[in-house]
Amino acid sequence: MTKVGLRIDVDTLRGTREGVPRLLETLHRHGVQASFFFSVGPDNMGRHLWRLIKPRFLWKMLRSNAASLYGWDILLAGTAWPGKNIGNANAGIIRETATYHETGLHAWDHHAWQTHSGHWSIRQLEEDIARGITALEAIIGKPVTCSAAAGWRADGRVVRAKEPFNLRYNSDCRGTTLFRPLLMPGQTGTPQIPVTLPTWDEVIGPAVQAQSFNTWIISRMLQDKGTPVYTIHAEVEGIVHQPLFEDLLVRARDAGITFCPLGELLPTSPESLPLGQIVRGHIPGREGWLGCQQAASAS
């Protein structure tokens, strides 16, 4: 049996309102639990449109057929009008999710984090994280114990900024296996659970066709030599590609794969995890930098 952590990122108002309820129903039908990470502040995702001038981002949008994949309401959110507050508008849906699934913070403002966190000060990072955690805790009525950086925009500064919040784990980077981030010699931070597998929008196109994606990603899960963690998005697998995701659950079960919340991947003694650090890097299919796992020594 292969155990795969299932991470569900919720970036937008529409993803929360439409995608999450469908995912909850789908997961319930198949007896699967996952980790949901919510953006709870303003939906300004449409402001990413300026990135179309960058060739790699434009190619990604064309390759994934973004207009039909996400919908124009997502692609234009927060452009000609102020972005609506996701948490306030969908508190009931978020509370229901937290009743049945592990629930953590993705971002206060996904667009702001993805665009500006790379040059924010530690204080600005802490204030933004605190704003998101406070809002999410007010909605779900219990402490937030985990987080996942929006767009995997994380580095050593982000690791340090999250330490005051006493989270059980963070999932802020891409990598191969769980690790303890090294803050300074002799001091480690909150365990990191990296995403190890590509997302739909990173690979779909000439190399992998939509109709063969599930076969391809299941093969990658079974071949993963680390701790497999797979990310889906409420805006994609919860809406236009919900049937594809349901098919994935069936095929994965038949292949001996069990999905679980990320928290279930943590060992009883996190001190046993190897040391590592998060550095800025790049991966195929994703425009811009993101946090990547790198080995570190205690010396």
From Swiss-Prot:
Involved pathway(s): Glycolipid biosynthesis; 4-amino-4-deoxy-alpha-L-arabinose undecaprenyl phosphate biosynthesis; 4-amino-4-deoxy-alpha-L-arabinose undecaprenyl phosphate from UDP-4-deoxy-4-formamido-beta-L-arabinose and undecaprenyl phosphate: step 2/2; Bacterial outer membrane biogenesis; lipopolysaccharide biosynthesis
PROSITE patterns according to UniProt: NODB
Keywords for this protein: Antibiotic resistance, Hydrolase, Lipid A biosynthesis, Lipid biosynthesis, Lipid metabolism, Lipopolysaccharide biosynthesis
Catalytic activities: 4-deoxy-4-formamido-alpha-L-arabinopyranosyl di-trans,octa-cis-undecaprenyl phosphate + H2O = 4-amino-4-deoxy-alpha-L-arabinopyranosyl di-trans,octa-cis-undecaprenyl phosphate + formate
GO biological process terms, semicolon-separated: 4-amino-4-deoxy-alpha-L-arabinopyranosyl undecaprenyl phosphate biosynthetic process; lipid A biosynthetic process; lipopolysaccharide biosynthetic process; response to antibiotic
Residue span, NodB homology domain: 2-260
Domain of life according to the entry: Bacteria
Enzyme class at the top of the EC tree: hydrolase
Matches recorded under InterPro entries: ArnD (IPR023557), Glyco_hydro/deAcase_b/a-brl (IPR011330), NODB_dom (IPR002509), Polysacc_deacetylase_ArnD (IPR050248)
GO MF terms held by the record: hydrolase activity, acting on carbon-nitrogen (but not peptide) bonds, in linear amides
Enzyme Commission number(s) from the entry: 3.5.1.n3
Function: Catalyzes the deformylation of 4-deoxy-4-formamido-L-arabinose-phosphoundecaprenol to 4-amino-4-deoxy-L-arabinose-phosphoundecaprenol. The modified arabinose is attached to lipid A and is required for resistance to polymyxin and cationic antimicrobial peptides.
Protein name: Probable 4-deoxy-4-formamido-L-arabinose-phosphoundecaprenol deformylase ArnD
Species per Swiss-Prot/TrEMBL record: Salmonella schwarzengrund (strain CVM19633)
Gene of this entry: arnD
